[in-house]
């Protein structure tokens, strides 16, 4: 089954992406706690705005990091994990 890159990711209600100085990195805050994101996840998370589709997120990161092999597949994998963990919805 292939991933539909035309889908638009949105952070779920109650979840907030932000930079947390105490963690020295980006986190995802939610009612039960916090998830510290690694650098790659933070870059992807910063582009989730409820307006861009996954293809646009891939295109933007490809501009910032040209020639990175399998960039699109890595972003798709992040989206699948984030959806499975109920961090995002995909419209």
From Swiss-Prot:
Keywords in alphabetical order: PQQ biosynthesis
Record bears the keyword Membrane: no
Function: Functions as a PqqA binding protein and presents PqqA to PqqE, in the pyrroloquinoline quinone (PQQ) biosynthetic pathway.
Similarity annotation: Belongs to the PqqD family.
Biological source species: Pseudomonas fluorescens (strain SBW25)
Assembly information from the UniProt record: Monomer. Interacts with PqqE.
Name of the encoding gene: pqqD
Pathway(s) annotated for this protein in UniProt: Cofactor biosynthesis; pyrroloquinoline quinone biosynthesis
A GO MF term: quinone binding
GO biological process, one term: pyrroloquinoline quinone biosynthetic process
Pfam families referenced in this protein's UniProt entry, alphabetically: PqqD
Protein name, entry field: PqqA binding protein
């Amino acid at each position: 089954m292939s991933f539909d890159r035309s889908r638009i990711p949105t952070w779920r209600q109650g979840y907030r992406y932000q930079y947390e100085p105490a963690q020295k990195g980006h986190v995802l805050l939610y009612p039960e706690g916090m998830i510290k994101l690694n650098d790659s996840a933070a870059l992807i998370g910063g582009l989730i705005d409820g307006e861009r589709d996954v293809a646009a997120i891939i295109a933007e990161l490809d501009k910032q990091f040209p020639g990175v092999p399998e960039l699109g597949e890595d972003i798709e994998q992040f989206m699948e994990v984030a959806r499975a963990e109920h961090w995002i919805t995909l419209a």
